[in-house]
Amino acid sequence: DWLEVMLGYMQEPDVAAVGPMLLLEDGRIQSAGHSHTPYPHNFYNGRSINELGELGILKVARECTGVTGACMMVRRNAYFEVGGLSKSFPLSFNDVDLSFKFLDRGYRIIWTPFARLFHFETATRPNVSTPQEVELITNRWGNRIYNDEYCRIE
């Protein structure tokens, strides 16, 4: 099942987080991991799960810059090592910030299409990013946001 699939990647000690393919209510992709080219967003948002993606990227587990906090399996000691989620991002970008903290410490983040879950995005909160959050994430991680080492295609 999906939980065992994600747990399998956590057997590698340098993996800090694993995320599944998240689907919208209508079955299209909500997130295939994060991409930060040219700004933080969900990779392949709105695309069909039947697509291969460039170079077959939607059909293989891969390292990525980050995964969506809606469903992110996290290694406990890595979470505490990096200071966990930041209170500076109460609505948006908290998963982006956490992912970058993991990467800065040398951990890997894995996205897998072999675990799939529905994500009813914004069903419990508004889909907003405050100007302060946008400015803070850009100031804190601009060097990484504008140079996504895992995603140079889309």
Predicted segments — roles?
Residues 21, 102, 113, 121, ...:
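Residues at the C-termini of beta-strands that transition into short coil/loop
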Residues 1-40, 108:
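Conserved donor NDP-sugar-binding/catalytic core segment of glycosyltransferases
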Residues 11, 84, 104, 139-142:
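Residues at helix-coil transition
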Residues 14-17, 31, 44, 67-68, ...:
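Short glycine/serine/threonine-biased micro-segments
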Residues 26-27, 38-64, 68, 73, ...:
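C-terminal, non-catalytic tails of nucleotide-sugar-dependent glycosyltransferases
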Residues 1-7, 56-83, 88-118:
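A short, conserved alpha-helix in the catalytic core of glycosyltransferases
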